[in-house]
């Protein structure tokens, strides 16, 4: 899969930078990997539930070419002070202080471990447009970028699902975050103006046209610093696993995603701990909420869809406790504005971004009003972007 890139100015600048860093631009190939938003279905992916994400046009661009030796040379426009990071193909152990290059190493390790031959070094220059710690999946975007780069340079012909799974494996086993498959799947399988209803239990999925009529999806960035590995993400993972384990003493289930709300409520005595009950209740209710939301979305009932966004945020705040002052201020202020059908945090939480479904004609006033309240409450400004739904990770045709 390849697309003709639209932003030639960005590529021209990156091409010049590649020549400056690596000497020339002979045989350079161009790649792009998006970020993602999750419309609804939060913290359900690692609980065997449904998610409803879409890839966005903000992402990570890469320029790459093969070398004849085994040296890997990396440069990021986002971290110029790090300069060129260099390592040998046979020395791919994770290193502290080399945060972004660890994702490259991880993908090399996972692809080689899956039996794919990567026998030469390469040069890779990247530029990420996704704000770090925004909850728009800058790490998964980079993993899938590296995946499509290596797939192309070495003619590996890796099936897209396997590439997505190796991206998740990099996150879980190499980086050390117990994430589900939502981010990598959305980024690997994304299509222009389509969202993905994904059953994370079976990996069956449905592409759903995004028909918003007179509404826009506005991304609201808290600009709060956050690192997923330092957050309570892994703690929530462990809590829902423990709740599942306790419910399995009587129920024949493999994941919380198999339960209806009624089945869950009838068996909370098995869990016996109020915190664990709250965590599991969010996973179950959010999963069922996501299925209802997708049906409303397809039917064009954006009002109902918006109400479910609001309910999702409330559950993430009260039961899963992953929001905090910044996300609550954005989402709850957004919900009160004219022309807004719904708003919720998106991503892992603990900072990052929220999204709102806003009438197109109200967007400017919305951003001003929410931005003003946020800065008054939090003490620094939020950032706002209107989301554009774009393609998944791909090689670019540069003419």
From Swiss-Prot:
GO terms for cellular component: cytosol. ATP binds at residues 76, 133-139. One of its GO terms (biological process) is galactose metabolic process. Mg(2+) binds at residues 139, 171. Its main location: cytoplasm. InterPro entries: Galactokinase (IPR000705), Galactokinase_bac (IPR022963), Galactokinase_CS (IPR019741), GalKase_N (IPR019539), GHMP_kinase_C_dom (IPR013750), GHMP_kinase_C_sf (IPR036554), GHMP_kinase_N_dom (IPR006204), GHMP_knse_ATP-bd_CS (IPR006203). Its EC number is 2.7.1.6. Signal peptide: none annotated. The active site is at residue 183. The record marks 36 as: Transition state stabilizer. PROSITE patterns: GALACTOKINASE (PS00106), GHMP_KINASES_ATP (PS00627). GO terms for molecular function: ATP binding; galactokinase activity; magnesium ion binding. It is an enzyme of class 2 (transferase). It is found in: Cytoplasm. Pfam families: GalKase_gal_bdg, GHMP_kinases_C, GHMP_kinases_N. Substrate binds at residues 42-45, 233. Pathway: Carbohydrate metabolism; galactose metabolism. HAMAP family: Galactokinase (MF_00246). Belongs to the GHMP kinase family. GalK subfamily. Catalyzes the transfer of the gamma-phosphate of ATP to D-galactose to form alpha-D-galactose-1-phosphate (Gal-1-P). This is Galactokinase. It comes from Lactococcus lactis subsp. lactis (strain IL1403) (Streptococcus lactis).
């Amino acid at each position: 899969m390849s697309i003709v890139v639209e932003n030639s100015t960005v590529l021209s600048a990156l091409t010049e930078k590649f020549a400056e860093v690596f000497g020339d631009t002979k045989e350079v190939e161009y790649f792009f990997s998006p970020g993602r938003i999750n419309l609804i279905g939060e913290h359900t992916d690692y609980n065997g539930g449904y998610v409803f994400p879409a890839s966005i046009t903000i992402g990570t661009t890469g320029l790459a070419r093969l070398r004849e030796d085994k040296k890997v040379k990396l440069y990021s426009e986002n971290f110029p002070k790090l300069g060129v990071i260099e390592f040998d193909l046979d020395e791919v152990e994770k290193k502290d202080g080399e945060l972004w290059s660890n994702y490259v190493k991880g993908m090399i390790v996972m692809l080689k471990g899956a039996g794919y031959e990567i026998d030469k070094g390469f040069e890779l220059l990247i530029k990420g447009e996704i704000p770090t710690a925004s909850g728009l999946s800058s790490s998964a975007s980079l993993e899938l970028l590296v995946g499509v780069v290596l797939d192309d340079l070495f003619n590996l012909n890796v099936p897209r699902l396997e590439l997505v799974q190796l991206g998740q494996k990099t996150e879980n086993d190499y980086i050390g975050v117990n994430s589900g498959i939502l981010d990598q799947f959305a980024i690997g399988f994304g299509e222009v103006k389509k969202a993905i209803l994904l059953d994370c239990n079976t990996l069956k999925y449905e592409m759903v046209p995004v028909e918003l009529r007179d509404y826009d999806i506005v991304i609201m960035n808290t600009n709060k610093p956050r690192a997923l590995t330092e957050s309570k993400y892994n703690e929530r993972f462990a809590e829902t696993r423990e709740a599942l384990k306790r419910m399995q003493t009587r129920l024949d289930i493999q994941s919380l995603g198999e339960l209806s709300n009624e089945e869950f409520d009838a068996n909370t005595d098995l869990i016996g701990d109020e915190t664990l009950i709250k965590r599991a209740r969010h996973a179950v209710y959010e999963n069922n909420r996501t299925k209802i939301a997708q049906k409303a979305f397809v039917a064009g009932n954006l009002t109902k869809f918006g109400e479910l966004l609001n309910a999702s945020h409330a559950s993430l705040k009260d039961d899963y406790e992953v929001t905090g002052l910044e996300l609550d201020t954005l989402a709850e202020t957004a919900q009160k504005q004219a022309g807004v059908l719904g708003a919720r945090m998106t991503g892992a939480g603990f900072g990052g971004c929220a999204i709102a479904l806003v009438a197109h004609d109200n967007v400017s006033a919305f951003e001003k009003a929410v931005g003003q309240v946020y800065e008054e409450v939090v003490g620094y400004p939020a950032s706002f972007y209107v989301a554009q739904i774009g393609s998944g990770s791909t090689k670019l045709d540069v003419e």
